[in-house]
Amino acid sequence: MLILCVLPSTMSRSAWVAAAISCAWVAYMHRDKRKWSILWRRYKKRYVLWGAGIFLILSLAAAGMFFLKPDSALGRRFMWKMTCRAIAAHPWGCPTGFACAYGEAQSLYFASGNYASWEERVAGSPEYAFNEYLEVALTYGVAMCILVLFVIFGCLWIGVKLRRYGICGALISLLVFSFSSYPLHLPAFIVTAICLLLACGIGDVIGKYLVLCVCLVLWFGGYAEKWTQERDACRDWVNARILYRSGAYEAANRAYEKLYPSLRKKGAFLFEYGHSLHKSGRYDESFEYLDQARLYSNDPMILNIMGKNCQALHEYKCAEAFFLISVSRLPGRIYPYYLLAKLYSEPDYRDKDKFGDMKWNVLNRKPKVYSTAIEEMRREVEEIAENWDTGSSIICSDDVESEE
């Protein structure tokens, strides 16, 4: 009852659905078949009417959950669509991980121009697919996903045969929740899933003690030390981030350099390191770390800073390519259009027609979140346009980088 009191306050529709389905399944499995058979024959019409009423209520509840947070629901639908496209491109798995494959699929989709306006509005740069099954299929391959599902349903079958309905219900709840969230990216849920699989019956088949011994060997064989090192590195990262955000980039660079061996697979860390190097004027080094960050994050800001590095090195074609990829990654963002407008106003790369197109996008596109940064970008683009015919352009020491 305590859990039922807390559940509504979470505003998690996935959790509500998972709890409802698992509870209904457990209640159904504990039914008295003989009594239900007698009642069905006696009150068949009444049960049919009740069933129709329950179906109507559930339909209204589903519609209500959608309209509770419509953009969130549409956003997940779009993420699943992009993940499926990425799976089609990488049916045997993507060795570079989810973020890289997802970002590539989304860029190609928006670059085609064949998409709905709501898709542009809800698109983002997610770290997870919000569907564990699709993410496993993309990261490790469709065959591995099928194998994992086979093992899970095998455990459920054993659990049902052993009449462990409560444990099976808990596992079903986790499976339903995994359909529209990312529980298996959190250690607590991973441990819970392993314990539930063992309790369902697979532990009786292969031996609980054997499984526990294997887990302990893996833990003490490296994972414990690795997680401890990463935890300590993340603590030091917080201190380095203070330097980064306060503008002490040289000091931040030294701190990031020490942390790099432990955090070299974290996209957010690599972006901060690369951006800090960019701010320090070390454009080649910045490009190197941002190129690594692309493998672990699909944030278009990585592409924007890579393009700015190229522009600072007077490699304008390369800069244009990165800015255009950023536009196709999230066409609703104004910042890459602003960067392209500034690029096309460079004395060695001036293009009035392309500048005009980018100016229109900067001035007329509606941002997701309005801010003073939007005003600054629009004002600067208008100033560049006013000074275009005189042959001069507005040169700023730094671009606006906080937007939307």
Region roles according to the model:
Residues 4-15, 19, 23-88, 214-229:
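A membrane-periplasm/extracellular boundary helix in multi-pass inner-membrane enzymes
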Residues 237-238, 268-272, 301-305, 335-339, ...:
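Alpha-solenoid helical repeat scaffolds
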Residues 252, 286, 319, 354-355:
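Single-residue signature of alpha-solenoid repeat helices
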Residues 18-26, 57, 167-215:
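Transmembrane alpha-helices of multi-pass inner-membrane enzymes
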Residues 85, 96-138:
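Interfacial juxtamembrane loops and adjacent helix segments
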